[in-house]
Amino acid sequence: VEPLKMDDLTKYTFLSGPALSPDGETCAFAAHQMDLAENEYRSDIWCYRLSDRKLTQMTTSHKDGRFIWLSDGRRLLFSSLREKEDIKAKESGEVFTQFYTISLDGGEAQKAFRVPFPVSSITEINPDLFLLEIVWWPPFETLAGAAAAEKPKLLQSMKEETDYEVLDEIPFWSNGEGFTNKKRTRLYLYDVKTKDLSPITGETFLAETPQLDETHERFAFTGIDFSDKLEIRNDVYLYTLKDKSLEKFSMGETFLTDYVDFWDKDTLFVVGQEQRNYGINENPKFYAFCLKDKTLRCLTPELDLAPGNALNSDCRYGGGSKPIQKDGEAFYFLATEGVGASFKKICPDGTVETVAQMKGSLDSFSIKKGKLAFIGFHELKLAELYTFSNQKFEAVTDFNGWVLRERTLSNLERLVVKADEKHPTLATDIDGWLIRPVPFDPDKTYPGILMIHGGPKTTYGENFIHEMQWLANEGYAVFFCNPRGSEGRGNAFADVRGKYGTIDFDDLMAFTDEVLERYSFLDPARIGVTGGSYGGFMTNWIIGHTDRFRAAVSQRSIANWVSKFCTTDIGYFFVPDQNSATPWSDVDKLWEHSPLKYADRVKTPTLFIHSEQDYRCWLPEGIQMFTALKYHGVDSRLCLFRGENHELSRSGKPKHRLRRLKEIKEWFDRYLK
């Protein structure tokens, strides 16, 4: 058994997208690994057969991570770049998605069809007709309709146009996507035989979550038409294939529908929120929308939990499965509850039941004919594929078992900080954990690092996080908690609108006090603090309000709510929602809650880590804070990652992820050891 090493990150296998075949007998999923030499990720499709436990690698091109089952139940349809001509065409700037099929019976993948747009999702209506969600942009349309002889000239013209960006709407860029002005997700029908591509939605319409009914004669989806400013609301639409009719249904003036499906032929299943009581982060409710009388009925008025998994980890890669899935009469979903993710179902009468819970994290799932498959992190194990029957989980893969067998890991010690006389600033108990250094000697004292999650509406749980375990193996105690603002404990607990840097700061400081009191091996003169996104905001805030931390690492942070409002992809709606103010309604309030205001008080040596293409918390946020600290004579450093975005720590290029970890450790070593 050896210590966990920084570059063990490059040896893990990340699993995603489990999907059971139509008969529920075979589960396909994607497996991803880092390729350090090429500085990229390799993705392949695997299948696990439930009846005889046979595990088969279906593809080996390392470029195949997204797929669907075809209705015959014997073949998978997936997008890939395999042939030299296709790779060359992509490199020249051509825009298309090439689909292949591969059979469970073996043999090579077969070319299926090509679509002249980037395809973000595909659904089979029948063997000759597919519903596509495509990324549409006017130049893509021009290219798609051009004759082969015209394409070189058009591609050259498009290449020249990359020197300019013309913007006339907000948002005009999006983290991970770059400039998005006039780009839309549109729905199309694709006829395999005629190669006809027919648009369902218009050029300025943003469509999402298309879902077929059981007869495959209709599909529902959500969307909004916009040309100047994207509003954070949408409507529900119903398309009937036979007569090509499109109906629009409004769920309410401020209603945001997250997901739509069919309870039955006359009733839509709607998941969404009115955003009236808790703003854009309000937990959604489940509804039934009657197509006959156009009425919306809330099935879960008392429910206060969010579908989806909000647990933090740096060991995920690849897309998830559909977040909500129907099987029989019920819909199934994951929900973040307390410090874990549980698997639940909702019945037509609105009854919500817990089906399964795992200590660790349930990441994604598939359910077909009562059969269940999950990607999960059980306790300190990394992701594996699990089946679930007779109230028991069973790991059916062992991609990452070597980590537990061959590396030293440290258990998570849970501590609950009580809201009592000792902690007068706490309004409620706070969940937290500490990971001891490895190896641990009770007669020694150790440096510690407080880690703060992003969101703020995400959460820490009891699952594997490489960065934490590695720092523990480097001699640090790592401690972390879920302050007010976090997910998993309902709307009221998560509501920090207009209070950033107040109650959340109090919770983090009370937690730090408790950790130092409870663990005498921690040296209070050698503790550091770090966090990313909202955690970066809190790091910036903390160093302006206390000198108790010897060093700080602020990552993809927020420094100034005014600049955040006017420059980032979500700023124009996120900032007023979270701060109850705009630069024009109350600029003083925004400045009051901006860490930059307090930069003249900072004495803590701070490393800033930022990505050049982070449009969620744009580069000027890190630069402003770094410049302010340098101006005031504080030891500081800015490490900028080219070609990376807000997801650097989770899906950045392998070499960049290692460099980020190296920068963090070396900064803390310098001041805490």
Please give the residue ranges for each predicted region.
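Predominantly five- to eight-bladed beta-propeller fold
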Residues: S43, D86-F96, V135-Y188, P284-F289, ...
